[in-house]
From Swiss-Prot:
Temperature dependence: Thermostable.
EC nos: 1.1.1.1
Protein name: Alcohol dehydrogenase
Species annotation: Geobacillus stearothermophilus (Bacillus stearothermophilus)
Free-text comment on the cofactor: Binds 2 Zn(2+) ions per subunit.
Record: residues binding NAD(+): 172-177, 195, 200, 260-262, 331
Catalysed conversion reaction: a primary alcohol + NAD(+) = an aldehyde + NADH + H(+); a secondary alcohol + NAD(+) = a ketone + NADH + H(+)
InterPro entries: ADH-like_C, ADH-like_N, ADH_Zn_CS, GroES-like_sf, NAD(P)-bd_dom_sf, PKS_ER
Cited function: Thermophilic NAD(+)-dependent alcohol dehydrogenase. Bears mainly an ethanol-dehydrogenase activity.
Length: 339
């Protein structure tokens, strides 16, 4: 089968023929139709996170396609089902985290396109219990980004605890942030969009943001305090330490700051202010299978629509180069042509 393979960190991926995976008990073989491209894939290809991915590696954790083979013990899926393979490739299923609905915190999880091969290939082996079905009225290209960008921002908004009518700030209106604005509006929240690009703020307005602010032109936290008394919650998708600091300062008493982006720096927290003002600081990573089902349903109902750019798998190195330069609008989705 054709695949894009990381053979050495920080080297271009190689488009090559590799062995088609075989499946065993509890697994399915998925014929990949499309796979979204995420910044995490770039980190995997560069090997620049503390825990390195396996090598060689087929990246991709937004792979979607059709079940082509069903292994022994699989009863809830059949050949022809439309499914996606998320970042949470599998978890142990019996630890405290798994049993309490926090499977994304399982210490024995496997991750698609990182610890196991992912969706940058014509076929992908998957743990049947962890693939998620795609609603019939959602195309593969539309569905792919929901498996990471969608569910990640949807879950982040859920954990803010913000209620309909309250204010939430979305920091960074990129691949995740532009989806977050739409989920927030669909959930009945008022939205302040924050970005250093005016074109991104115009997009946020088109997507329903109630207020926008460019922190290069004015103090974003001060703007929010003056306009709405501070936001009830902030979700930071930007990979930027200043964005995290501004988000913290934008929150009213009793509010929540949810961290999603992964900048390399440390972030100092003023303990006195945090305690005195009852500020909650929450880390949020992707979402559970249930979160993903809910996120997909929003998209299927037309309430959330990812801005996508479709490219063939062979263009992956060009896509990575553009991603490094910040030249991607929305999300890139790779497609794989049928043989």
């Amino acid at each position: 089968m054709k695949a894009a393979v990381v053979e050495q960190f920080k080297e271009p991926l190689k488009i090559k023929e590799v062995e088609k995976p075989t499946i065993s008990y509890g697994e399915v073989l998925v014929r990949i139709k499309a796979c979204g491209v995420c910044h995490t894939d770039l980190h995997a290809a560069h090997g620049d996170w503390p825990v390195k991915p396996k090598l060689p590696l087929i990246p991709g954790h937004e792979g979607v396609g059709i079940v082509e083979e069903v292994g022994p013990g699989v009863t809830h899926l059949k050949v022809g089902d439309r499914v996606g393979i998320p970042w949470l490739y599998s978890a142990c299923g019996h630890c405290d985290y798994c049993l309490s609905g926090q499977e994304t915190l399982c210490e024995h999880q496997k991750n698609a396109g990182y610890s196991v091969d992912g969706g940058y290939a014509e076929y992908c082996r998957a743990a049947a219990d962890y693939v998620v079905k795609i609603p019939d009225n959602l195309s593969f290209e539309e569905a792919a980004p929901i498996f990471c960008a969608g569910v990640t921002t949807y879950k982040a908004l859920k954990v803010t605890g913000a209620k309909p009518g309250e204010w939430v700030a979305i920091y960074g209106i990129g691949g995740l942030g532009h989806v977050a604005v739409q989920y927030a509006k669909a959930m009945g929240l008022n939205v302040v969009a924050v970005d250093i690009g005016d074109e991104k703020l115009e997009l946020a307005k088109e997507l329903g943001a109630d207020l926008v602010v460019n922190p290069l032109k004015e103090d974003a936290a001060k703007f929010m305090k003056e306009k709405v008394g501070g936001v009830h919650a902030a979700v930071v998708t930007a990979v930027s330490k200043p964005a995290f600091q501004s988000a913290y300062n934008s929150i009213r008493r009793g509010g929540a700051c949810v961290l999603v982006g992964l900048p390399p720096e440390e972030m100092p927290i003023p303990i006195f202010d945090t305690v005195l003002n009852g500020i909650k600081i929450i880390g949020s990573i992707v979402g559970t299978r249930k979160d993903l089902q809910e996120a997909l349903q929003f998209a299927a109902e037309g309430k959330v629509k990812t801005i996508i750019e479709v490219q063939p798998l062979e263009k992956i190195n060009e896509v990575f180069d553009r991603m490094l330069k910040g030249q991607i609008n929305g999300r890139v989705v790779l497609t794989l042509e049928d043989k």
